[in-house]
Amino acid sequence: MKSAEIREAFLRFFEEQGHTRVASSSLIPGNDPTLLFTNAGMNQFKDCFLGQEKRAYTRAVSSQKCVRAGGKHNDLENVGYTARHHTFFEMLGNFSFGDYFKRDAITFAWTFLTSDKWLNLPKEKLWVTVYATDDEAYDIWTKEVGVPAERMVRIGDNKGAPYASDNFWTMGDTGPCGPCTEIFYDHGADIWGGPPGSPEEDGDRYIEIWNNVFMQFNRTADGVLHPLPAPSVDTGMGLERISAVLQHVHSNYEIDLFQSLLDAAAKAIGCTNDAQASLKVVADHIRSCGFLIADGVLPSNEGRGYVLRRIIRRACRHGNKLGAKGSFFYQIVAALVAEMGEAFPELKSQQAHIERVLKAEEEQFAKTLEQGLKILEQDLAELKGSVVPGDVVFKLYDTYGFPMDLTGDIARERNLTLDEEGFEREMEAQRVRARSASSFGMDYNSLVKVDVATEFTGYHATSGSAKVVALYKEGQSVDMLSEGEEGVVVLDQTPFYAESGGQIGDCGYLQAGNARFDVRDTTKTGGAFLHHGVLAKGSLTVGAPVETQVDAQVRHATSLNHSATHLLHAALRQVLGEHVQQKGSLVDSQRLRFDFSHFEAIKPEQIKALEDIVNAEIRKNTPVETEETDIDTAKKKGAMALFGEKYGDSVRVLSMGGDFSVELCGGIHANRTGDIGLLKITSEGGVASGVRRIEAVTGAAALAYLNAAEEQLKEAATLVKGSRDNLIDKLSAVLERNRLLEKQLEQLQAKAASAAGDDLSAQAADVKGVKVLAARLDGQDGKALLALVDQLKNKLGRAVILLGSVHEEKVVLVAGVTKDLTGQLKAGDLMKQAAAAVGGKGGGRPDMAQGGGVDAAALDAALALTVPFVEQGI
């Protein structure tokens, strides 16, 4: 059976047993901040097992995509060198949430594995383990299923503590837990290894293929196990492992799924498919990289993005080792889509995006890979001992982009280890330097501790009546604020929007009789809205009634920019792809700023497309609609949620243009898209690896921006004595004239240099049979000096030349050595000395070198180094 057929058979079997087929969840866990990546089938059902979520079904079956690289579960360094380690794998699983338990779970597993209708595995090849004290499971296996006692193994606490066992599963120190039973396949006596629980169990003969976890206890902090009222079942069977069994091969890399990827990798690299470890690395890594990118991860220097970058660069290095020339990794994506795109449609829909991301990352790493490998080879050649120093590992990481595990891979091939502690010391020193170079403002919310909650009334109002429930000055609770004092006012209700979701807090004022408190900003801590500002007049006490007034003009302008941000987000996903995710935003009354995930600069034509799409939606003048609903209903409607954001039971869904933009948002918005008027993008750039930023203006600010641009065009036209209509032609003519003048200037400089060369050649001194010339030619640039040195080398014959100049307040140096002398004297060595003398750096080839510095006063002394340099070298 092919891997795809096995997957479908598993899902279909359990559907026939009353299970609901559930699609694989994203590799980015949406409900578990403790996980870097989804690494088991049960991850998406965690809240069901904990009793915190009720679903419409109590039986489920899935084929879950999983990644184990980085974090606690990290298989990266073993991938390619063993038969079964992968960064990406599929976990087939069936689950019961308080429905069936041990008897049915065991029977289902045995039937699927051994029935001639399904996998038809020989029963005598299967071994079973149970937890040592789980007599119930043991009896079901032996008395009901019929597994003979000689193929049953009880596994006790083999990890040094109570319930610390390969056959006892825990979610943590406390919480749901229970025994498990595992099914092993015997690959035959020709492979070394013993049954589970034996001294030889680490061999490859007996391989675990299915694990059934029985969650029947809740462990409390005192270590006591209490029976759960509704026991559950969590099972997992690796698709790759069971495919190897059914296809009669021992290594996962020999199954049909991997053979197509290995062939594609070999073709892309230009090598033969001969099962080399490096080829296996590439074939494995294309799966994890392809799926991670499809799920929205982009290469970066932190978190999930850095794990992806490590995997990509490890694949690139192994391809390089096999002789790959240029970018190759992205070329394997098509084979991945052909193999797995049917089961996982996200691969098909995002194939082009995955290829672009991989190619861009390959090209970026290629700039430093070869140079970094040379540096590492030099360091290893000079190494005394078997440990690569931490500072070397750090240099490769910091300067050449080598993740530590990539350097570790290379070291491992030489039977060397890394000084990981030394590397961590270097990393910490860098972090300390970064912290000391940064300054952080104080979070004034952290100073204010408020137990009250404020009712927000600002969605439909900018003014109202309220009561002061708390006052703070310098973070301390006070009963009164006096005129001129800065402080924080907390009200029982307010129309002031508190800073959230990138939208700035409202400003305005509070009026209490003759007292007036000017609100400069509004923030939120817990359920309390904090009005920050200064008491401009009178005094204000706790309990006082106040009239609230938001600055409606600022609020209105801010709301337009916020709505425009939503339209821009939707347009970005249309133009660039659905991988675009919001990474941050700032919305105020003057402009909007939007940070989003993307791997390359946006092209001018894409900027235009974004503006066209957004402005088309603005011109449609559709209503901006809001709806309060639960999170599941919102997601079913296609509402985009910010990843990592925590949402309550009730969420606010904001829609524009029907389904053009549907997002969860609690901010203040326009009434209709037409209110925005116009959007104009003013800048686009990168702010971090894999994160781009767009800044834009709307409405009156956009009109002002365009008017200013119009004035600049008029001014430019005046400068070239033209008009707006013929400005391009006039500018082209000016640039062409400038080009001709520069060419004439170069010709004149060349003539002058030639004349100077004739004069300078007569100044050359003879040092041990070598013509030595050091001269100062202020005002000449580096290009002119290079031409002159070439000319002098031809005229002087056997010669060493150093020319210097002060040009535009900087020192320029050029050194030349005729080729008959480069075995003894090198221009680069002379340049290093001379450049250092003027406070700079330099280098180059043995026959020609360039450099410079900042200390013009030291130029003569630098030139004087030439004769001693020759005397010492000859």
UniProtKB/Swiss-Prot annotation:
InterPro entries given in the database record: aa-tRNA-synth_II/BPL/LPL, Ala-tRNA-lgiase_IIc, Ala-tRNA-ligase_IIc_anticod-bd, Ala-tRNA-synth_IIc_core, Ala-tRNA-synth_IIc_N, Ala-tRNA_ligase, Ala_tRNA_ligase_euk/bac, DHHA1_dom
PROSITE patterns for the chain: AA_TRNA_LIGASE_II_ALA
Keywords for this protein: Aminoacyl-tRNA synthetase, ATP-binding, Cytoplasm, Ligase, Metal-binding, Nucleotide-binding, Protein biosynthesis, RNA-binding, tRNA-binding, Zinc
Enzyme Commission numbers on file: 6.1.1.7
Superkingdom of origin: Bacteria
Cellular component GO terms held in the UniProt record: cytosol
Disulfide bridge positions per record: none
UniProt-annotated location(s): Cytoplasm
Enzyme class: ligase
A GO biological-process term: alanyl-tRNA aminoacylation
UniProt cross-references to Pfam families, sorted A to Z: DHHA1 (PF02272), tRNA-synt_2c (PF01411), tRNA_SAD (PF07973)
Binding site for Zn(2+): H562, H566, C665, H669
A GO MF term: tRNA binding
Cofactor note: Binds 1 zinc ion per subunit.
Catalytic activity: tRNA(Ala) + L-alanine + ATP = L-alanyl-tRNA(Ala) + AMP + diphosphate
Cofactor: Zn(2+)
SMART domains linked: tRNA_SAD
Domains as described in the record: Consists of three domains; the N-terminal catalytic domain, the editing domain and the C-terminal C-Ala domain. The editing domain removes incorrectly charged amino acids, while the C-Ala domain, along with tRNA(Ala), serves as a bridge to cooperatively bring together the editing and aminoacylation centers thus stimulating deacylation of misacylated tRNAs.
Family: Belongs to the class-II aminoacyl-tRNA synthetase family.
The protein, known as: Alanine--tRNA ligase
Organism field: Pseudomonas fluorescens (strain ATCC BAA-477 / NRRL B-23932 / Pf-5)
Lineage start: Bacteria, Pseudomonadati, Pseudomonadota, Gammaproteobacteria, Pseudomonadales
Gene encoding the protein: alaS
